[in-house]
Curated annotation (Swiss-Prot):
This is Synaptonemal complex protein 1. It comes from Mesocricetus auratus. Residues 684-703 have a biased composition (Polar residues). Residues 684-709, 786-808 are annotated as: Disordered. It is found in: Nucleus; Chromosome; Chromosome, Centromere. Disulfide bonds: none annotated.
Amino acid sequence: IVELQFEKEKVSLKLEEEIQENKDLIKENNATRHLCNLLKETSARSAEKTNKYEYEREETRQVYVDLNNNIEKMILAFEELRVQAENARLDMHFKLKEDHEKIQHLQEEYKKEVNDKENQVSLLLIQRTEKENKMKDLTFLLEESRDKVNQLEDKTKLQDENVKELNKKKDHLTSELEDTKMSLQRSMNTQKALEEDLQIATKTIYQLTEEKEAQMEEFNKAKTDHSFMVTELKATTCTLEELLRTEQQRLVKNEDQLKILTMELQKKSNELDEMTKFKNNNEVKLEELKKILAEDQKLLDEKKQVEKLAEELQGKEQELTLLLQTREKEVHDLEEQLLVTKISDQNYSKQVEELKTKLEEEKLKNAELTASCGKLSLENNKLTQETNDMALELKKYQEDITNSKKQEERMLKQIENLEEKETHLRDELESVRKEFIQQGNEVKCKLDKSEENARSIECEVLKKEKQMKILENKCNNLRKQAENKSKYIEELHQENKALKKKSSAESKQLNAYEIKVNKLQLELESAKQKFQEMTDNYQKEIEVKKISEEKLLGEVEKAKAMVDEAVKLQKEIDLRCQHKIAEMVALMEKHKHQYDKIVEERDSELGLCKNREQEQLSVKTALETELSNIRNELVSLKKQLEIEREEKEKLKLEKENTAILKDKKDKKIQTSLLESAETTCQKFDSKTTPSQNISRISSSMESGKTKDNRDCLRTSAKILSTAFVKEYTVKTPTKMQMYQRENKYIPTGRSNKKRKTVFEFDVNSDSSETTDLLSMVSEEEISNRLYNNNSPNSHLTPKQTPLSLSTPESFVSLGGVRKMREDRWATIAKTDRKRRLKEAEKLFA
């Protein structure tokens, strides 16, 4: 009984030990269950995160759609503003055309009036000839009433003296005619020089147009190159999107397979005997993980290489930006050449305006001289011969004036042709600018799309990296679990050895257990084979995925580099577009105010023109009355001269008759000579004294008449010149006067430069500075200054002061303005580049 009790106690101890072992096993099972629950929770969290990611992706898509709608609205608004600006510009253009047509209509009316007045002058000349014939008849009647011989002798003496003086005057007038011919030759030479300058200007304009056409072809080639680049970028983005989709599908499949594997591992972890064999599998996995780490290092090296490639791409971007800057500079050069052509055309128009002002000044002088002719018209009794000569000269002058008119018309036609060419060039530039703007908008839209695609790709890549990190953490946890299980298995082996020593008595029971264990081993081997097959398949799939991931990473890095380049270009373009939009808005607002001012000023100018026309009409009427008076006086003078000629002829005949009678009467009157001598001496003394006084008075009067007659002749020439609107009046001044005029007109270059009515603003302006805005000098101020400088009182003096017009202070050289703009753009570009480089460094860090 005692022995049995001892045996029972031993058995009870063994049972207690086995119960403790069973409790430890139960604890291990609970721990594995806890790990499985943790894995379930992590999988649920990952599912929630995926749902959130999808929800956020939908939100981003909606935001992208809203942004696209806003951008389209902005584009439509900008196009509406542009259309409004073009409409305003066209309205102003039509108004200017209407004003130009009105001015041309007025010029045609003036020409018609001038032709009518010429016809009237021809009729008056015919009437004058008729009156001259009548005066001849009257002179024959007056010859019969003149019988006194002594008075006729005195008159013949005086007429001889007058003839001498007239010969002197003729000589003087011939010298003046030579001087005028020299001045005409000089004017012709100047006109030829102007024609040559115009030809040179036309040649330069043709050359510029050819160069611009070549440059436009280059721009079109550059456009085609850019379009090819854009298509390539689109193709690359499409391929990247397809690859990302395939990768997403593969990741989803891998996640499903991982879930299945986790369920199988949970089932197999309940069995303790499998842990021994699972140890080997864990070692294999460790080796595979080492290989994965080596591959990750390779990937890091490839990332470094990709960064180098990104740097090279940045260098290429800089080269492209430099090319764009050179193209922009070429565009600026073309604009400068256009401005030079505009300035040359303006100079030619200014020269024409100066000639018109000179004609107006000469008209004013003619008006003053006509006033002086009214006083001197009574003293023109003995100048009929000179008037005939001067009539011939006037015809010559009129022919010269007509020739000069024709030359002026040719010059005006050439100027109009140049203006038409300028308008064509401006239209071409505007069309080119519109094309650039459209291309910029298309590039913006494409870049926005590429940015959004790149952002989505980056987000997906980041999520994949996070998933990879999670998988790495899981692998590390599994490694730790495998190590713990291997330690636990070693401890179990030691305990089993102790139990084998103790279980010699229970070998029968163990045999039964061994049979069960053999069955379990067979099942384990079959499970191992299945597991190995699954692991081999998974390893192959993992290797394929690694290769595809490497390729995708390379492509993603390339896409990142391309996206960075596109983002940089887009930011630069956005900044420039924003600056240009702001400047265009400011310029449009300012130009609106200035257009209103211009319209008001043009209305005031039209009022002034109407007042001037009324004044000119009043002056024309006064001149016509004066012409009629002067012609009447000339007719009376011609009649008197014819009477005097007939008297001279009669006196000559009477002298011959008296000489014959004296020869016959000499013999008869020798005795009465002594008595008659005393009486004749007394009479002769009484007659000579008044004749001497008369000769002195006549000499003094004629010396004044010569000067006045010169003025009268000049006025007659100028009166005929005023009948035409665009004619040059030719004077016959002395040599001293010619020298004085040459000295006076030396500084005409400065006056021409200063004499400006400015109406300029930059079409291709990019900035809203004060120098690029309208700078104006109203024509009212210029007309008032011209009138003050050329007042009618000032023309009485021989000196003429040159016109001096003050230039406005707002004018600045165009070269300085462009340099300021280029410096500002350079500083803005430098700051933008620095900021972008800093942002890129932060992203890479």
